[in-house]
């Protein structure tokens, strides 16, 4: 768990005010069938939605009118494709039935995993203001030992549901990760063939748990690599979970893939290496090199991954620092954001005059995530000029009054300020 969110309610929030809700234990499931069905439904609705977007940009339609128009577009799509609409509704209901509404008095704080499924629970029937502030917390470093009053190294499974039993390999791996152990030493007794069948199951829990089981043996990792390299986008992400869990065991298989010509494949490999973190430090050099790729997608993942992989190094190379200096000036907003993120992770180990200059300049960036990570990074450099710039900025702003200008759909194209919002 590298990211945690905190939800804060500044007012009393009841069920009839439309609170936020979460789906417990959903953070490790990709919801493939739901997302695929929803994506197809959105694709069929795209023409109507684009028309509404264009009218909003031209200011010939109000936001209130657009809400009604969007509902009308989806209704029309459902009438034209009733079977798809029925399937979509059925799949969504399976998740909606597991939702837990977050209600409470003013001052309520809720801490949740960054990837947990969360959304509005219901409409605001009272019409009263219902504000909620989100805070994002990030680890400075992956754990090397327990951070709590820890006595028993064994994982204790409190729940006895079928779902919890299926997901036990996942919980056990995460438990070991939080203890600072590199990977689980528990050997699987399930055959690789049986696990392969489970990996290909449409049930997310069965598939993900199988990937974690396969990660425990060399034969299993070979199978995960084969699937990871396949054209089956439905299974590649599941295989990636297993390769992350395999840690150092997967590095010899991933190393030859970093130099492939396909930028999408290279990006996927680097993404896994970043998820593995410090245990992947033997491949840090090619990841640093990839940070100057012509592909914006590869640059994004590489610039982020260097901060995760190098976090436990005593000293960072000049080549790494130069790539981060360049990242802060990249034409792509996501690369600049990830550059600031990695600098915040690595702190004074990557401090240079150009790093400080770049971060100070990016305090005025159009993308709110670039601004946010830049101010965070300046405070972690242990540099007098950086700290003075951070204090000056915080004194002037106190609160970021700029709009969330970076909330745009991320594509494989360079993101610029002047591009139309999509």
Task: Name each model feature, range by range.
Residues 1-106, 117-128, 135, 139:
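Non-heme Fe(II) oxygenase catalytic core, chiefly the N-lobe of the double-stranded beta-helix
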Residues 18-19, 33, 145-147, 381, ...:
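Short, charged, solvent-exposed linker or helix-capping segments at domain edges/interfaces
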Residues 23, 112, 382:
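A conserved hydrophobic position in a structured secondary element of the catalytic/binding core
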Residues 50-58, 70, 155-162, 371-375, ...:
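A general structural signal for short secondary-structure boundary/capping elements
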Residues 111, 115-197, 207:
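Non-heme Fe(II)/2-oxoglutarate
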Residues 168-187, 205-217, 234-249, 256, ...:
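Structural detector for internal amphipathic alpha-helices that build alpha-solenoid repeat scaffolds
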Residues 188-199, 217-229, 248-259, 278-292, ...:
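Amphipathic alpha-helical scaffolding segments comprising HEAT/armadillo-like alpha-solenoid repeats
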Residues 202-204, 231-232, 261-262, 294-295, ...:
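Short inter-helical turns and helix N-cap capping residues of alpha-solenoid HEAT/ARM repeat scaffolds
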